[in-house]
């Protein structure tokens, strides 16, 4: 077998990439989110041997908030896939090097992984994040009294998150790692969250808070939520509406992606009193032009993974 060569992706690679991702990831990775990116070919590096494509890596430019109140240009790395026949040859390391060379003016690089040892030799270091609260769940009271008509439900789909954009941005101003979402980021979030329930808390004609959640078997998952500053009652109303749906679905445990803020913890003590904060160490960073500034409360939600 010849050594793999690494190059930029081409339009003719799309079918082979989908096949690679279907076998390299568990569960299989759908190309839907990648297809949203109009610049996906320029952002993707592939490895090719004499049997065809045997590896891929995706480097997406993102703007993430930092602890000094600034915004970092970040090279977000994902879809690192190596075919079975090409493993054990250092190909993942070569793919990482290739995408870093294409990072342009990015300040630093970010990835999330369950196998951090693969990336340490490329200069990446892990960091911790209190991203979720998890544990047993049960509906404590007949909630949602008075929320009917103020909390509107719909399934997440194309364009459904447009009404909540302002709420998201204003709620994330002090959260380290939280992306400043552009149109592409919002479209990708709609793909990642597709099919989950979007709960919007309405005050008059204004959205003052929202949540995206779904039951997965007996597990209730809160994927993303936000309320306008000072609208703490909206958070309680959203959780009350979610509780009604989860009770009907037979949810017995929960995983809640909420930042470690006092107002969030207060609401969760009533919603899921037995759930506890989890330490997420799947994130890794590497300096490019400079080191990342990640001091403070960190938060990154499912809609922004890449």
Residue spans for each PLM region:
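Extreme N-terminal starter segment of soluble prokaryotic enzymes
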Residues: 2-6
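Active-site rim helix/loop that mediates acceptor-substrate recognition in acyltransferases
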Residues: 18-66, 176-198
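Conserved beta-strand in the GNAT
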Residues: 46, 52-62, 74-76, 81, ...
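Conserved acetyl-CoA-binding loop-helix of GNAT-fold acetyltransferases
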Residues: 79-82, 88-101, 232-244
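Conserved GNAT acetyl-CoA-binding A-motif
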Residues: 96, 101-114, 248-260
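Long, hydrophobic, well-ordered secondary-structure blocks that form the structural core
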Residues: 108-134
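Amide-forming acyltransferase catalytic core, primarily the GNAT-like/NAT-type
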Residues: 125-226
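Active-site/acyl-donor-binding loops of N-acyltransferases
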Residues: 125-142, 223-232, 240-306
